[in-house]
Each structure stands twice: as C-alpha cells, then as structure tokens.
A protein has these predicted regions:
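A nucleotide- and high-energy phosphate-metabolite-utilizing enzyme signature
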Residues: 1-145
Length: 145
C-alpha cells in the first residue's frame, strides 16, 4: 500500500531490492539474520547507505542499538584495495547511468549532474568509508558536519 501509485502519485516509493539478500529472504528478517548477512556478505554500497541510517519509527532505542551493534561493519578499521576498487566501480556505474557531461550553466542539473549534490555526497561518503574506521570524527550522518 505504501508504494502504491494513485491519481496523486506515489505515497512513498519503496525499492525492496535494497535490503539484505532480497531474492531469498522475506521483506523483514530477524536482527540476528541481518547481522549474519552484513558480517558475511555485506557490500560497500550497503556500508555507504548505513552511514546515514537512523531509526525513525517503531522502537527507536532498538533501532539505535541495532545500528550501534552494526558499527564494526560500517566503520572498518582497515580498508583493503578490493574495497577501494569496489568504490571506484560504484562511481563508474553512477557515471554510466547518469552520464558525466560537461557543466553547462543553463539547464545544468545541480543535484545529479557533474559537480552536483550527489557527487559531493559520494565523495564525502567515500572519505568516511575509507577513513571513518580510524577517525571517529568522520562518522557523522550529515554531509557538512
């Protein structure tokens, strides 16, 4: 119902592929299953998404505890070359989908275009992923903290 399209548009679009193992698990999984997933097969794009995660509904304390317990997954002390290559691949994919045309003042997409908001956020999150495990000051959810 929440992602249903009405005459007024979507209430809220939900992409159910953006969750642990979407092909073989139910929409909601146990906390232990989530921990096992992230510990064993969690990916860098999920780390990046979890940087900004925060509980917003339900039992806020349980949500905060979950994110706190997931902290070692999000904030790795040692980031290997494969992980850095994976981040580069994410950036290449963004450019392939969105393109990376030159900046033109008239009609330039300030959100998704070259040098736009999303590119700045990606740069900041990359720095957080690479260095946040050792530098706790980089662990903020806001881009401009």
């Amino acid at each position: 119902m929440i992602d249903e399209s009405t005459a007024d548009g979507y209430v809220f679009r939900v992409d159910l592929r953006l969750r642990p193992d979407p092909v073989s698990t139910p929409v909601a999984i146990s906390v232990n299953s989530a921990f096992a997933y992230y510990e064993n097969v969690g990916q860098n794009w999920e780390r990046a998404a979890l940087i900004k995660a925060r509980p917003v509904a339900g039992d806020i304390a349980i949500g905060a505890a979950f994110l706190s317990d997931l902290s070692p997954f999000i904030w790795r002390k040692y980031f290997d070359f494969a992980a850095i290559a994976d981040i580069h691949a994410m950036k290449r994919q963004i450019h392939a989908v969105r393109g990376h045309e030159t900046i033109a003042v008239a009609g330039h997409d300030i959100k998704l275009g070259r040098g736009g908001i999303r590119e700045i956020e990606f740069f900041v999150q990359t720095q957080q992923l690479v260095f946040g495990g050792r530098r706790t000051a980089l662990r903020g959810r806001r881009t401009l903290d």
